[in-house]
Structures are given as C-alpha cells and as structure tokens.
Amino acid sequence: MALATRATGGAGRRKPVRARCARGLHLVSCHKTQLLGFTIRNAASWTIHPQGCEDLTAAASTIIAPHDSPNTDGFNPESCRNVMISGVRFSVGDDCIAVKAGKRGPDGEDDHLAETRGITVRHCLMQPGHGGLVIGSEMSGGVHDVTVEDCDMIGTDRGLRLKTGARSGGGMVGNITMRRVLLDGVQTALSANAHYHCDADGHDDWVQSRNPAPVNDGTPFVDGITVEDVEIRNLAHAAGVFLGLPDVPSATSLSATSPIVSHDPSAVATPPIMADRVRPMRMRLVFEQADVVCDDPALLNDAPVSISSYFD
C-alpha cells in the first residue's frame, strides 16, 4: 500500500511511501526501440521509464494520468542516449517529461551511474503537469544535449525546470536548449534550482545553506542553458528564477527574442521555486548565484533582480 497526499498551489507534496508503485512501462537496456501510436492511462507511478536505452523513438501517442495523482510522470528517460519524443500529448499528475541520470548511493556509490545524452522533444502538447521539460533531480550521471522545440506547454507549473537536489549528488547538466515553445498559464516559466527541497533530505541545512561549500565530486554543475523564441502568456509568478550554488554559480544563457505577452491578473504571489526561505513573489526575472545573460532585458520589462531580496 502506498500513501500520498498532494499539496496545492505548486508547493510540492508530502508522500509517506510504504511500497513502491509499479511503472506503467519500464524499458531496460533496449536498443533501436519504437513506441508508436499508443495511449497509456492511469499508471500507478512513472508512466514510461526507459533506463539504459539507446536509439529510442516515441511518437504520435498519448499519456494520461489523473491531475491529482502523485509521481505519475509521463516519460522519464534515465541514463539513455539518442531519444526522440515527437507528437506526444501529455496530461499527467506530475512532470510531463523528466530527464534523469541516476543518483549516487548513500555512501557516494557511483558505479551504477551512466550519463543521459541526446534527448530531443518536438511537437508535443503538455497540458497540464508539474513541469513541461524537467532535468533531475536524479542527475548524478550527467545530462547533456537536450533540446525541446515547437511544443505547447499549457497550464504546467513550470515550463523548463532544472532541479539538482543535494550537493552530494554531483553530475553535470549542459547544453540544454528550448526554442519556439509556447508557455500559456504557467506559474514559473523557466527555473534552475540547486536547493530543491522535495527529496528526503531536502530541508537539511547542508542542502539549503546559501553559504559556499568545498567543490568536490559531489558538487552538481549546471552550464549552457539556452532559451530562444519562447512566448509566455498568462504568467502567474515569474518568467525566470535561477537559484544556484555559491560554490559554482550556474551559467544560464537566455536569448529573449519574444516578449512576455501577458500576466494572469488573478494570480496570487507565491514562492516560485521549491527551495526553503523563498518568499512569495511576482517578478519577471530573478536570480542568485547564477550567471544570467539576456540578449534584450527590455523585452522582459524589468531588469533581473536578486532573489536574495526575497529570502526569509
């Protein structure tokens, strides 16, 4: 029996788990696999979980789960290479697509880890879900060369979301590109969060501390995130929130070639990322310990401001 409760307002969920729910479809070490023209509904946990797979295509398909069902991610490639997701409709209770690369063991074990590289997402509809395209939080093996383009994300909590979790996990995230994507009715459009608090130890001081720590094999790195031609409508909380580590500030490149079209006039200020001590806000672009480059900040109306102004 698995017990779970979901908090409202994008604030995460408490989920005491007594048993592991089954995946909808768990593919292990598969090569040259095609998943075409199918519908999967109401999986108990992650709907499709390719693990250690290579040359995988999923196309012209539908993935559905109740909107209040915990952990029902749509498609989670883990330690995979060369994955194409095209023309898939997602309507799930958690992240639509969450790219993962494993997690170190409790004593730092890493012999089971392998990188994820070469993930392409095209012509997909995400409506709704917690995140449209998510990296992490299990990313110890490293995630590289991920592209999402020509997609619509409607009513998702986040559009593009990176969450690295604890400092002990390690891993490198690099060359992540989002382009020609519509974000409509999202809460926070773009986020990178190195203090993600929803893991078991997420509220511990060594995860949430904003003080520098020694850089070692357990330090996660995020570098080379590019966003181009993204249109944001009915925005609730923030266009972009980037909270990195003081040990290694995230390098995030924003090519803002389309303006924010509109805010949701009914939205209430809310903490825009899942990290401790961040107060409610409604801002355009905020950052802390992150190197943010915006081609034309005027398109965002407000210059970037420091998120530390919103720490409790």
Swiss-Prot record:
Record's signal peptide: none
Major localization class: secreted
Listed PROSITE patterns: POLYGALACTURONASE (PS00502)
Keywords of the record: Cell wall biogenesis/degradation, Glycosidase, Hydrolase, Repeat, Secreted
Secreted found in the keyword field: yes
InterPro entries: GH28_Enzymes (IPR051801), Glyco_hydro_28 (IPR000743), PbH1 (IPR006626), Pectin_lyas_fold (IPR012334), Pectin_lyase_fold/virulence (IPR011050)
Record family assignment: Belongs to the glycosyl hydrolase 28 family.
Protein name per the record: Polygalacturonase
Organism this protein belongs to: Rhizobium radiobacter (Agrobacterium tumefaciens)
